[in-house]
Each structure stands twice: as C-alpha cells, then as structure tokens.
C-alpha cells in the first residue's frame, strides 16, 4: 500500500509541478494506518509533495489534539523537508458537535491550537470541517487571536475575546470556561458514535445500556483507531467498570454544563443587542447537550445498579437497600430528563410493587440482531444514541 500510494501521489505532484513551477500538492493520508503513513513519508517526493494531516489518528477531536501519531508524522516530515498543514476545529460548528452550531468553547479551541502548533514544524494550520463566518463565533474569533499572537496567554485571549460583551464580559468568560471544560471532559474516546450527540434521543431503551462502537474496513480503523476508541464493535456487553467510567465522565460533563447555564441565564439580557441572538442559541444548545449527556449517564447507572441487585440475588445475598434506593432515585431523575411520563413511570411503579418482577423485566441485556448503523439515514437517533440498540428505535 505505501509504495502504490506514494507513487501515485508523486506522479500527481510532479505533474502539477510541471504546470506550476512553484506548485506543491498537499496530500491527506486519510484512513491509512500509522505504519503505512510513516512509510509513505519515506517515499514521497519532498520537492513537490506536502502533507495535510488530521491532528489525531482518529481524525480531529477537540479533547485529544496532537496525539503521538501526529507528532511522529511532523518529526518524519521535518527530517525530509516535507511541509505540513495541521488540521483541527477552528470554529463552533464541528463534526463532533453537530447539529449544535453555537456551543462556545473558545478556551478549548485555544488549547487545541496551541497543542497542534507546538507539536512540531508546521507550514500552517487549517480548518478540518468548515465554518459559518457570518455568525458570532467565539471559537473562530479565538482562532484569529491565536494566529495573530500564538504566545497569547489564556487570560489575555479571553479578555480580548470578551470585549464586545462590555459589562457582561466577566460572566461571559465564565460561561466560556465552563463550556470548554465540559467539552474537554466529555468522553469522546468511548466510541466514534459519541459525537453528534445532538442527534441522540434522551428517551432511551429500557433494556440494559450498551456502548455502541463503530468501525469500517480501513487500515486505520482496523489498527490504530482500536486504541483511539474504547468501543469499535458491539460483540460483547461493556464491562461494569467501563460502564461506570463513562457514566461518571458524562456526569462531570453535565455538571460543567449546568454551571455554565446558571451563569448564562443570569446575563443573557445584559448583552449588547447584536450578540443576544447567538448567545441565546448557545444557551439552548448547551441545555440540549446537557439533557442528552444526562440521559446517557442515567441509563448507564441504572444498568449497573440493576446488575448489582441481580448479582446479590444470584449469590443468595440480601439486596443492599442503598442500591435499590439509588436506582429508584436515578429513574425518577431520568424520567424528568426524558420529559415524558412513560415508559419510566411504569418501571418505577413495578420497582416499588414487585422488585423481583422488575429485575426480570427492565435493564436486561437485549439479544443483538447484529444490525449495524443505517447510514442512509445519517441523522437518525438510532444511529447516534450510543446506549440504546438500533432495534429499539425501529419498534417505537
């Protein structure tokens, strides 16, 4: 593969050089494994080929910029004088966050820019996915500040960024910090399907929570991305500790979002009028983000608690009342988060009236049909609700 790919790229680049004596063809070695890309660098023509690289072997992740693969690629490229463009998110609309377009995480953006810029020798930095420059976008404006002064401190950058918000600037900075920390805390590494959370449904299945993985038949997915993501298939139920880990990180994310929303709600009417619309959209989207994060956390915790109670019963041990009480409390919060009485109401009543029947009915493993995501219906909740099997949505 490296020999064939590099020969093809070199031919294209040399042809371009014949047409444009100063031309450089920038190539993005997408979906190749780390080993393949390293070998390709050794075979490329440095006189006319450049590289455009994701800042992570798993493409681009705001929480994991400039991974070891990216740094190694910069080292190898520098040794052969091959120019490199580093790719990351420079604005709010990203593949990770869509359909949310207004969640402001400028501090996370600055940290990602700095990590990529300091990873090695770069010819430049470019946007990976695309922006909406006509809207107020603190993330994109932060990128502009960084390009102007890569050594700017976080405090100075946030201060300059918030100037248009006038007397509300200090509180707006607080919102940005909390939202950035929430997105950095979010467990992007659990599965590729953890992205695009706005497409997920808070009304999850009442069977045991799963953690849906995704994978494709490419070198990167069948090699390195098995390390980048905790789940790349759905062949086995996730371990208790994995479920708990992801649940706790979802909870931490939700806490940061709740804190950001408290501050944002207090100041939304104090902003200059031209900035109010986008800020209110940010509040709306952060609220929707939090609802979905909580839905994941609740479903995962309900599953582990139900399994703890079942395990005690199987071993002839008494049920820990703390587990049962916590399970009920989580279900009540989950019901409120769903925004609907059912199906959680029936489950809560059964837990109260007949705990044994409840354990035989709810949060049990569901036999998998082996059905994968239906990408013909890209934006469906079935594809993107990672704790619920696709079949659950088909039967609703």
Regions of interest found by a model, annotated:
Residues 3-396:
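Substrate-binding groove of N-acetylhexosamine-processing glycoside hydrolases
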